[in-house]
């Protein structure tokens, strides 16, 4: 994953921009950018911190929810629930 290859968030952002299949900017809470890749992994960046999520793994999704601040977690609640439900169905 890009976050593992690039500990520097600027380098990770540049690499993510080049290969992401989707980019979303969310301004709830501290604000963050999500890059989604074709292997169902997601890189989330906020300032100088980043989180790499495997959207096929419930623990990784829960870790993402924990990583978010309270306001962003509330805004992402339905997406987090959808991701967890899709993993449980598999």
UniProtKB/Swiss-Prot annotation:
Domain of life: Viruses
Key words, A-Z: CRISPR-cas system evasion by virus, Host-virus interaction, Inhibition of host adaptive immune response by virus, Viral immunoevasion
CDD domains (UniProt xref): AcrIF2 (cd22280)
Transmembrane helix recorded as keyword: no
Job description of the protein: Allows the phage to evade the CRISPR/Cas system type I-F.
Organism: Pseudomonas phage D3112 (Bacteriophage D3112)
Protein name: Anti-CRISPR protein 30
Biological process terms in GO annotation: symbiont-mediated suppression of host adaptive immune response; symbiont-mediated suppression of host CRISPR-cas system
